[in-house]
Amino acid sequence: MYYCISFTHKNTDIALREKLSFSNEAKKGEFLKIISTHENIEECLVISTCNRVEIVAFVKMACAEFIVKSLALLCDVDKDILLEKADIFEDSGAIHHLFSVASSLDSLVVGETQIAGQLKDAFAFAVKNNFCGVHLSRAVHSAFKCAAKVRNETQISKNSISVASVAVAKAKELADLTQKKAVVIGAGEMGELAAKHLIAAGAKVIILNRDLQKAKDLCERLGVLSEYDSLENLKKYLNQYEFFFSATNAPNAIITNSLIEELSYKRYFFDIAVPRDIDINENENISVFAVDDLEIVVQKNLALREQEARMAYGIIGRETSEFFRYLNDLALMPIIKAIRLQAKEYADKQLEIALKKGYLKKSDKEEARKLIHQVFKAFLHTPTVNLKHLQGKMQSDTVINAMRYVFDLQNNLEGLNQYKCEFDMENNDEIY
């Protein structure tokens, strides 16, 4: 069954989420390797963003305690706290949750579009490292289709916003950004989004990054209202400007009290990274806003999009039902093939017996074979048609199990590709 263990902004604070975050692929790979050794876990992947850590799996039976215990040991967190906080979804609930995540209905900022890329990256990593097979491939592929439907059939992503844009919106509430210089730390996706929104608000931006070439490339994309420098010069900039937006992948805080000088004017720090980049004391001239502090702005966004969200959840509900109908349909075709294969094997076997016992001349073998197969074909025609008519209907699962039992088909099914996936897992370009 499909299985999901979820830690998000809804059930955990940022301090716990940053401990759980997978800031590098090595840690993610280590965790997936650990949990994939469990006898009940067949496939698994991890989605890790600033607002969530999701463990999505295909399992033989529930195994939340093992997964959570493994996560707790790796991240040095109390297992009991995690078990208490975790939201656990099974089977249709897990698929509905995955579709909601992919469609940005479960995001801190409803309608933000970054999550689709983050899910794609998580899936690609799991496929590349052999943690993800056909079951999760189908689920994720269907999640992308669902997300596309939500985007196309609702206005949920119209004028789409992100955590970065919410941070800039909060900055605009605090001061007029026109012609001001704002420092963006980090040249990744979140940093680029923050820079674009700052420029749109009339500000000029300075990009600081450890990799100077990446900072330069970003500035070239942004245009004339930007400049760049090395992260090594961070202290100089921290004590020269008013607005700072930090979005790096650093495992520990990069802006600390030792870098901050006392100044006479007000400075605003927006920490949009998880784990957090900023660990400084606030005072009358220093204000720090982390991801969770932007909740009020987010709630305004949620109210505006509430009607669209209701429509989107309707789509997700229908797509969840359709997904399980699709799985039942996949199971029907091998049943039909197996019955026909079984009939052919019995016919060929009885034909050989008849030849050995002299009931049939060798010269008549082919004609007899054709006749027997025609009889079986005619006999199986109506059952085959009726089975095909069951496709997409709720009772198909019951009939499938009955047919397996009546015809003793379990062994026959093992040789068939009953789990054919609709896209090539080796081709990452086909994932999204």
From Swiss-Prot:
Question: What's a single GO MF annotation on this record?
Answer: glutamyl-tRNA reductase activity
Site keyed Important for activity: positions: H97
An example GO BP is: protoporphyrinogen IX biosynthetic process from glutamate
The reaction(s) catalysed by this protein are: (S)-4-amino-5-oxopentanoate + tRNA(Glu) + NADP(+) = L-glutamyl-tRNA(Glu) + NADPH + H(+)
Coiled-coil annotated spans: none
**Active site, per annotation:** C50
Q: Which InterPro entries match?
A: 4pyrrol_synth_GluRdtase, 4pyrrol_synth_GluRdtase_dimer, 4pyrrol_synth_GluRdtase_N, GluRdtase_CS, GluRdtase_dimer_dom_sf, GluRdtase_N_sf, NAD(P)-bd_dom_sf, Shikm_DH/Glu-tRNA_Rdtase
Name the domain of life: Bacteria
Q: In which pathway does it act?
A: Porphyrin-containing compound metabolism; protoporphyrin-IX biosynthesis; 5-aminolevulinate from L-glutamyl-tRNA(Glu): step 1/2
One Pfam assignment? Shikimate_DH
Q: Which UniProt keywords apply?
A: NADP, Oxidoreductase, Porphyrin biosynthesis
Q: Where does substrate bind?
A: T49, C50, N51, R52, S107, E112, T113, Q114, Q118
What Gene3D superfamilies does this protein map onto?
Glutamyl-tRNA reductase, N-terminal domain, NAD(P)-binding Rossmann-like Domain
**Which of this chain's residues are annotated to bind NADP(+)?**
G186, A187, G188, E189, M190, G191
Known EC number: 1.2.1.70
Q: Which CDD domains match?
A: NAD_bind_Glutamyl_tRNA_reduct
Domain remark text: Possesses an unusual extended V-shaped dimeric structure with each monomer consisting of three distinct domains arranged along a curved 'spinal' alpha-helix. The N-terminal catalytic domain specifically recognizes the glutamate moiety of the substrate. The second domain is the NADPH-binding domain, and the third C-terminal domain is responsible for dimerization.
What does the further note read?
A: During catalysis, the active site Cys acts as a nucleophile attacking the alpha-carbonyl group of tRNA-bound glutamate with the formation of a thioester intermediate between enzyme and glutamate, and the concomitant release of tRNA(Glu). The thioester intermediate is finally reduced by direct hydride transfer from NADPH, to form the product GSA.
How does this polypeptide assemble, per the annotation? Homodimer.
Q: HAMAP family, from UniProt?
A: Glu_tRNA_reductase (MF_00087)
Q: What does this protein do?
A: Catalyzes the NADPH-dependent reduction of glutamyl-tRNA(Glu) to glutamate 1-semialdehyde (GSA).
Query: Into which family does the record put it?
Result: Belongs to the glutamyl-tRNA reductase family.
- For this entry, the protein name equals Glutamyl-tRNA reductase
Q: Which gene encodes it?
A: hemA
